[in-house]
């Protein structure tokens, strides 16, 4: 099998991200026939159909999704190679770390775990330019962004039965307990309706919920944890929330411990083996670990 060239990888990514050969051609400054020819060549080299063609465009097959994820990650290594080599050339005895560092994180982690780490990272390595995207921790979540090649490092919830996508490296940064949060001064918070949001916790914590006969089914669903906190503060219900989310709690709510057998969740970083060896990702992991606790 012949190796795919960088331009062939770029074309695969462009077709997947634009949803069609014509749109990919326009984005890359190529003709549609050149894009079609390149994709057919890539399919012949890889021995698999990568895109389903239709009148409305092109969508990756399962094989295509895997190919595009690898393509993104390989192209990213080309970028990092250039940045690290240039930094080594200017380092005068030590490596100068520079370039874009792509980070994916769920909302409360982006608000509370990342800022102190990024502040120290900027002080030590001013040439690094972090790009942070907040993603919902549902389904593949932040770990999926890393696996798909859209992020160099993700801040994700760990420890679920599904685990991180195969082939990724991870490390625990914090273990946070869940608490009962309810309107301040309420005489019987457990009698209130339960408020929840989709990305609150995984199935491993939900099993604890199901074993508690005092927890009703959620009657109110909100978009995110900030909305849940606001609604609880307005007296509309109670909620069970992790500590990171509760850092935004105001005097409008009270927080009650759920005891030593209450649920906990692990929050950590996720990256690929190739990104784990890059200078910028290694530097960020060091800062995240020093933020730990």
Would you name each region that the model predicts?
Residues 21, 43-65:
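A short LG(V/I)-centered, amphipathic sequence patch enriched
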Residues 45-46, 67-94:
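Alpha-helical linker/hinge and terminal dimerization helices associated
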């Amino acid at each position: 099998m012949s190796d795919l060239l960088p331009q062939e990888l770029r074309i695969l990514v462009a077709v997947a991200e634009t949803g069609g050969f014509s749109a990919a051609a326009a984005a890359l400054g190529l003709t549609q026939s050149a894009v079609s020819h390149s994709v057919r060549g890539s399919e012949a080299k890889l021995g698999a159909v990568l895109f389903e063609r239709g009148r409305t465009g092109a969508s990756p097959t399962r094989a295509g999704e895997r190919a595009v994820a690898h393509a993104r990650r390989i192209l990213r290594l080309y970028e990092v190679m250039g940045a690290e080599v240039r930094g080594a050339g200017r380092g005068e005895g030590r490596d100068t770390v520079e370039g874009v560092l792509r980070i994916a994180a769920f909302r409360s982690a982006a608000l509370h775990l990342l800022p102190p780490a990024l502040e120290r990272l900027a002080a030590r390595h001013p040439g690094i330019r972090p790009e942070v995207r907040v993603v919902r921790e549902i389904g593949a979540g932040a770990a999926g962004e890393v696996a798909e090649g859209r992020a160099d490092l993700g801040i994700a919830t760990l420890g679920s039965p599904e685990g991180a996508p195969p082939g990724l490296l991870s490390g625990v940064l914090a273990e946070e307990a869940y608490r009962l949060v309810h309107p301040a001064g309420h005489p019987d918070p457990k009698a209130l309706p339960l408020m929840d949001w989709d990305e609150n916790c995984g199935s491993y914590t939900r099993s604890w919920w199901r074993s508690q006969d005092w927890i009703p089914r959620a009657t109110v669903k909100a978009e995110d944890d900030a909305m849940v906190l606001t609604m609880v503060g307005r007296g509309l219900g109670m909620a069970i929330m992790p500590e990171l989310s509760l850092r935004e709690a105001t005097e409008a709510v009270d927080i009650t411990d759920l005891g030593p057998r209450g649920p906990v969740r692990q929050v950590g970083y996720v990256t690929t083996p190739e990104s784990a060896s890059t200078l910028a990702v290694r530097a960020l992991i060091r800062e995240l670990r020093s933020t730990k606790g």
